[in-house]
């Protein structure tokens, strides 16, 4: 008896169904993952099991929403990059101005324009509601406050210069400390004011100064003695008198340690100058721009920020 081998081939087709009511778009539809696969039972035909074709249902979606989201993300990235560029340009323009004292009128105009552009991109519209950003020590980099210029001027006290002006905010205790540090050949000293602040609006705080503090001088307690000094081209050997110089150095170190260990001098501030207000117009983790009485502007950089080391 002859044996006949029956070979049957079935084609498998995929049908894509799109609702006729779908909105007509100019771009081809974006296909999302298969939502369902319909399985039909096996059908027996003449003893041969036949599996019907599978029907895949694929949902089409408009690309408009996805495109809008991508566009918004690109614009946000560009905005951040522009803000960082403005910050760097501002810091670069402050170089050599001695906190504003030595700035020319052209440089002041350039700085003012950069400040205005940054203020328009303020990422923290309500600074007093973001106290964690305000908290910490801020170093003054620039000001237009003319009453501060006499302090910055060199030559008032010979060999003494303003080394640093800072403002430290403690948002937990609502306190502010303004400090000026002076540096000279023999050491450093500081004068500071302690104040309390109250929040008056999302951008404005009222400051009430309570106390002034004159810090204890931090004198240099060590002097490096060279092996020789050169006077008018002639080298003078100091080894024969090194013992005498060492004795003088020890005495100076003892005096310096005694003075530096004394407590600071505190004093009360006059009531008529004990209040002020401060408006923060730009704030992020690196830079703070504030405006005070009379429209004066202050640019401060957070301690530890890489912007302090251009």
UniProtKB/Swiss-Prot annotation:
UniProt feature coiled coil, ranges: 65-94
Subcellular location: Plastid, Chloroplast, Plastoglobule
Transit peptide: 1-59
Pfam families: PAP_fibrillin
InterPro entries tied to this protein: PAP, PAP/fibrillin_dom
Modified residues (Phosphothreonine): 61
Keywords assigned by UniProt, alphabetized: Chloroplast, Coiled coil, Phosphoprotein, Plastid, Transit peptide
Chief location of this protein within or outside the cell: plastid
Record has Plastid as a keyword: yes
GO CC terms in record: chloroplast; chloroplast thylakoid; chloroplast thylakoid membrane; cytosol; mitochondrion; plastid; plastoglobule; thylakoid
Top-level lineage group: Eukaryota
Family from the record: Belongs to the PAP/fibrillin family.
Other comment: Simultaneous down-regulation of PAP1, PAP2 and PAP3 leads to impaired long-term acclimation to environmental constraint, namely photooxidative stress imposed by high light combined with cold.
Function recorded in the entry: Probably involved in light/cold stress-related jasmonate (JA) biosynthesis.
PANTHER family hit by this protein: PLASTID-LIPID-ASSOCIATED PROTEIN 4, CHLOROPLASTIC-RELATED
UniProt protein name: Probable plastid-lipid-associated protein 2, chloroplastic
